[in-house]
From Swiss-Prot:
It holds the Pfam family Seryl_tRNA_N. L-serine binds at residues 231-233, 285, 384. GO terms for cellular component: cytoplasm. Its EC number is 6.1.1.11. This is Serine--tRNA ligase. Homodimer. The tRNA molecule binds across the dimer. GO terms for biological process: selenocysteine biosynthetic process; seryl-tRNA aminoacylation. Belongs to the class-II aminoacyl-tRNA synthetase family. Type-1 seryl-tRNA synthetase subfamily. PANTHER family: SERINE--TRNA LIGASE (PTHR43697:SF1), SERYL-TRNA SYNTHETASE (PTHR43697). The lineage of its organism: Bacteria, Bacillati, Bacillota, Bacilli, Lactobacillales. It comes from Lactococcus lactis subsp. cremoris (strain SK11). The keyword Nucleus does not apply.
Length: 423
């Protein structure tokens, strides 16, 4: 959530930055007008309350003198009625103001590329060689079905579209991957967590999913309103919601593997086959809590942690800086890692690493006490390390052999009981 004081102090500058994120200036102008009206009413209300206190003192003095205080009582009743009316108007204005501000995305960092959509993203680097085949490479869904390790037909029967069963070596490969990822992040100082897979709506608000992206989630239809997590970012970030941390302990780094549940409301017709876009998938998440002056160094380190997984798996990838028009709601800067998918002859997103600066911390009230004892908002960061199903897809396609078998990457063989080939 943005700081209303910052908007007030630099309205035109903030409006220009938000315009690069698709926010119309009219919305900011409405917010600006409401803020002015709100401050005017606060001044008026405080003046009337001071007047009411003064009249109350007069009434007490008159009554002590056994005099007639009816005039003062009538005056106080009139002032009280005015205060009540102003406070009611103030409450309505604050509600309207809040409705606007909670829907505004984060301000982009100065290094974030300005652009309308993914076409304006900027490639930062490419790492690794894309494989060459002396045969036509198959898509991972065909490989998985032919090997009997991925079953979409029965997943669809049991649940519906965009669900599947992992079976045998497929299930073991999935498990091997997330155990490997967690072990690697543990070596980098991340504390491993097992989180709740359902959260309350305050938690969804804290990380910025609610209210703007409510349609993208699965929510329990009872009076509790719990939500199946779309990413472990939500419970991990909200772990410290409403708390003040010791600045000397920052940065704090968490990692967790969890299922992620997404309705994919706006994805009809996109990636209808395979592991790229599912309603339920496993993902290893990284979350950091950092001091503001250290957060961009921590973003580079987090991105390197995600890259480390791809490098050790021997997968070719590229790093892309997302444009203002393609970046997530809560992010100030985002790097996407895109892995090479041979059957599609392109790179596909497998990780997204973001610095949210104090945007989530303000929504969730996560603060720290610095060395001078001052309490201030910290910065939050999150990143995939990695999306497990998409990593399975990348391994199946990049390590396929002409006979349809899959060579297991060497780094994963200890996690798969020494298995060298899936056939």
């Amino acid at each position: 959530m943005l700081d209303i004081k910052k908007i007030r102090a630099d309205f035109d500058g903030i409006a220009a930055k938000l315009a690069t994120r698709g926010v119309e200036k009219e919305k900011l102008e409405k917010l600006h007008d409401l803020d002015i009206k709100r401050r005017e009413l606060i001044v008026k209300s405080e003046a009337l309350k001071a007047e009411r206190n003064s009249v109350s003192d007069e009434i007490s003095q008159v009554k002590r003198a056994k005099g007639d205080a009816s005039t003062q009582i009538a005056a106080m009743q009139k002032v009280s009625a005015e205060i009540k009316a102003i406070d009611a108007e103030l409450a309505e204005i604050e509600e309207n103001l809040n409705e606007i501000i909670i829907m505004l995305p984060n301000l982009p960092h100065e290094s974030t590329p300005i652009g309308a959509d993914e076409d304006d993203n900027v490639e930062v680097r490419r790492v690794g060689q894309t494989p060459t085949f002396n045969f036509e490479p198959k898509a991972h869904w065909d490989l998985g079905e032919d090997l009997g390790i991925l079953d979409w037909e029965r997943g669809g029967k049991v649940t519906g579209s965009r669900f599947l069963f992992y079976k045998g070596a497929g299930a073991r490969l999935e498990r091997a991957l997330y155990n490997f990822m967690l072990d690697e992040h543990g070596k980098e100082g991340y504390t491993e967590m097992i989180t709740p897979y359902m959260v309350n709506q305050e938690s969804m608000f804290g990380t910025g999913q609610y209210p703007k992206f409510k349609e993208d989630t699965f929510e329990l239809k009872d009076d509790r309103g719990f939500v199946l997590i779309p990413t472990a970012e939500v419970p991990l970030t909200n772990y410290y919601r409403g708390e003040i941390l010791d600045g000397s302990e920052l940065p704090i780094k968490f990692t967790a593997m969890s299922p992620s549940f997404r309705s994919e409301a706006g994805s009809a017709g996109r990636d209808t086959r395979g592991l790229i876009r599912l309603h339920q998938f496993h993902k290893v998440e990284m979350v950091k809590f950092a001091k503001p002056d250290q957060s961009y160094d921590e973003l580079e380190k987090m991105t390197a942690n995600a890259e480390n997984i791809l490098q050790k798996l021997g997968l070719a990838y590229r790093v892309v800086a997302l444009s203002t028009g393609d970046m997530g709601f809560s992010a100030a800067k985002t790097y996407d890692l895109e892995v090479w998918i041979p059957a599609q002859n392109t790179y596909r997103e497998i990780s997204s690493c973001s610095n949210c600066e104090d945007f989530q911390a303000r929504r969730a009230q996560i603060r720290y006490r610095d060395e001078d004892g001052k309490v201030q908002l910290l910065h939050t960061l999150n990143g995939s390390g990695l999306a497990v199903g998409r990593t399975v897809a990348a391994i199946l396609e990049n390590y396929q052999n002409e006979d349809g078998s899959i060579t297991v990457p060497e780094i994963l063989r200890p996690y798969m009981g020494g298995l060298e080939v899936i056939k």
